[in-house]
Amino acid sequence: MNSDTFRHFYNYHFTENRKLWDSFIVPLSYDQFIQPESYSHGSLRDQIVHLMDVDEVWFCELRGVAPSEALPAADFDDRQVIRARWDNIEQMMRAYLAGLTDEMLDTRPITDPEEDKELIVWQVLLHVANHGTDHRAQLLRLLHDLGVKTQGQDYIFYVYDNL
C-alpha cells in the first residue's frame, strides 16, 4: 500500500458517509433520528456522533494535536450542527491525507496515549476506515429497522462508479 491508496480509500469513506447522511439521515423525522436504541452506541444520532468523534480523535493523534473535547451525543440536538462538525472533521482528515507520504506510513507519530505509541500510521489508517465501515453498517441496520429502504456500501461499487 502507498499514500495514494489511502487517499483513494478515504475518498470512499467520505463518499459513503455523505451518501448515508444525505440519502437516509436527512429525510428522517427528528424523533426517528434520536430514537433510543439498545444496539451498539444507541440512536442514529449517537452512532453518527461516535463515528465522527473516532475519526477526529485518531487523526488528531496522527497529527500530534489534542482533539476537541468529545461532547455527549445529547449535546448535538441539531442535525445542522452535526453536519457542520462532521464537515470540519472531514476537512481536517483530508488535509492530513493530502500531506501523507509513503515514508510516513511506517512511522509511529503517536505520543499519547501510552497504548497507542507503538501503532504505525498505516495501521491507524486501516483501523479508522474499517471502523467507519462497521458503524455505517450498524447505521444501515438501524435504518432498516425503522423501515427505511437502504442500499449497500460495498467498496467495489465505489470503484465501479469511479473508474
Over which residues does each language-model region extend?
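Short, contiguous alpha-helical
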Residues: R7-V26, Y30-P72, P113-L163
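Helix-adjacent hinge/juxtasegments
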Residues: G64-D102
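Short alpha-helical interface patches
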Residues: D78-N88, D102-L105, V121-H127, Y158-N162
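Acidic catalytic patch
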Residues: A98-E114
